[in-house]
Amino acid sequence: MSKTLNIIWQYLRAFVLIYACLYAGIFIASLLPVTIPGSIIGMLILFVLLALQILPAKWVNPGCYVLIRYMALLFVPIGVGVMQYFDLLRAQFGPVVVSCAVCTLVVFLVVSWSSQLVHGERKVVGQKGSEE
């Protein structure tokens, strides 16, 4: 019985902490003059708490595992909502595909440039001139 209560406590604590960060983000978003989703601010709060080790990762791990495990199921309502606008998407299919392709290319270029900036040029092992 004690083990069962311990597992229930771990899941309860994890979800309470995740939801506390979510509602803190929603509250902060309501105070800001710009429109930023509260869920994004909540994720940033959770990230900062975990990165600074204010909040131990093992406290939120059980809840995160459950959410990640069933993540595909959480996208079903979004997909149904998008299908309500199918006619609009069909009419604007070309611009949507072009914008997705351009955005993908821009992200690829920015990531490659920033990776080159951070890591610099590295010599390949066995390449001529790499023996010094």
From Swiss-Prot:
GO terms for cellular component: plasma membrane. InterPro entries: LrgA/CidA, Uncharacterised_UPF0299. It comes from the Bacteria. The keyword Nucleotide-binding does not apply. The chain crosses the membrane at residues 7-27, 31-51, 63-83, 93-113. The keyword Membrane applies. Keywords: Cell inner membrane, Cell membrane, Membrane, Transmembrane, Transmembrane helix. It is found in: Cell inner membrane. Pfam families: LrgA (PF03788). It is a multi-pass membrane protein. Its main location: membrane. PANTHER family: HOLIN-LIKE PROTEIN CIDA-RELATED, UPF0299 MEMBRANE PROTEIN YOHJ. Belongs to the UPF0299 family. This is UPF0299 membrane protein YohJ.
